[in-house]
């Protein structure tokens, strides 16, 4: 079945995390990951691959922006894998792994997806990324000063708590769920690639 992994990341970003109504806590430069949420775990300062080694604050924030975006997409993708085993009105869902069904999409849907993803990514760039450098004529690959990674200013349901500690806890929860979802989505894809069939078929006729 088709998964939701192909959806534009920014189209769903606001659904996964509310925009802050409070001023984010300012961290000292000597804090792990410059004090960003997501480091509170039993392993402590966990960075075995050394991604943060020697990185300045804007670069660390850029990595967090990428992690948050991928986590949000993965949460929808994981949910999509489960839901679409039983509910797939647009696609049959019965002809092999999801990754093999991508070429089966009609051309008009590719056009719609391309335009939608392009507009969504343009919005995200305008919201958080540095402007074009007038000296080089190229866009800087860093976030704007003062931009909080993942904060696209979208909170239609008013979910963001007013208390700074509660808001940080919400950020911690989103990151934890996003990280788990990335592992889950990768597991779904790997399982389908190995078994050659859809996720639900691998476990038998889904009745949930």
UniProtKB/Swiss-Prot annotation:
Cellular compartments annotated: Plastid, Chloroplast thylakoid membrane
InterPro entries per UniProt: Chloro_AB-bd_pln (IPR001344), Chloroa_b-bind (IPR022796)
Main location: plastid
Stimuli inducing this protein: Expression is increased 5-fold under conditions of low light.
Domain of life of the organism encoding this protein: Eukaryota
UniProt key word Cytoplasm: no
Transit peptide: 1-31
Keywords: Chlorophyll, Chloroplast, Chromophore, Light-harvesting polypeptide, Membrane, Photosynthesis, Photosystem II, Plastid, Thylakoid, Transit peptide, Transmembrane, Transmembrane helix
Transmembrane spans: 102-118
Coiled coil: none
Protein's GO biological process: photosynthesis, light harvesting
A Pfam short name: Chloroa_b-bind
Any one annotated GO CC term: photosystem II
GO molecular function, one term: chlorophyll binding
Gene3D superfamilies: Chlorophyll a/b binding protein domain
General function of this protein: The light-harvesting complex (LHC) functions as a light receptor, it captures and delivers excitation energy to photosystems with which it is closely associated. Energy is transferred from the carotenoid and chlorophyll C (or B) to chlorophyll A and the photosynthetic reaction centers where it is used to synthesize ATP and reducing power.
Similarity section: Belongs to the fucoxanthin chlorophyll protein family.
Subunit organization: The LHC complex of chromophytic algae is composed of fucoxanthin, chlorophyll A and C bound non-covalently by fucoxanthin chlorophyll proteins (FCPs). The ratio of pigments in this LHC is; fucoxanthin: chlorophyll C: chlorophyll A; (0.6-1): (0.1-0.3): (1).
Entry protein name: Fucoxanthin-chlorophyll a-c binding protein, chloroplastic
């Amino acid at each position: 079945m088709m998964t939701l992994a192909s959806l534009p990341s920014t189209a769903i970003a606001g659904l996964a995390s509310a925009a802050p109504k409070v001023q984010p806590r300012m961290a000292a430069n000597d804090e792990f990951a410059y004090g960003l949420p997501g480091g509170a775990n039993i392993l402590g300062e966990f960075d075995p691959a050394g991604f943060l080694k020697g990185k300045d604050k804007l670069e660390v924030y850029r990595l967090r922006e990428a992690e948050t975006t991928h986590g949000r997409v993965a949460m929808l993708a994981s949910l999509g894998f489960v839901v679409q085993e039983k509910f797939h009105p647009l696609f049959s869902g019965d002809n092999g792994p999801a990754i093999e069904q991508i070429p089966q999409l009609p051309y008009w849907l590719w056009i719609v997806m391309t335009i939608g993803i392009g507009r969504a990514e343009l919005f995200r760039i305008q919201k958080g990324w540095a402007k074009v450098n007038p000296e080089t004529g190229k866009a800087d690959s860093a976030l704007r000063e003062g931009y909080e990674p993942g904060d696209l200013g979208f909170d239609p349901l008013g979910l963001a708590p007013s208390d700074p500690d509660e808001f940080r806890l919400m950020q911690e929860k989103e990151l934890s769920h996003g990280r788990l979802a990335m592992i889950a989505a990768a597991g779904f894809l790997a399982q389908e690639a190995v078994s050659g069939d859809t996720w639900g078929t691998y476990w038998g006729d889904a009745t949930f």
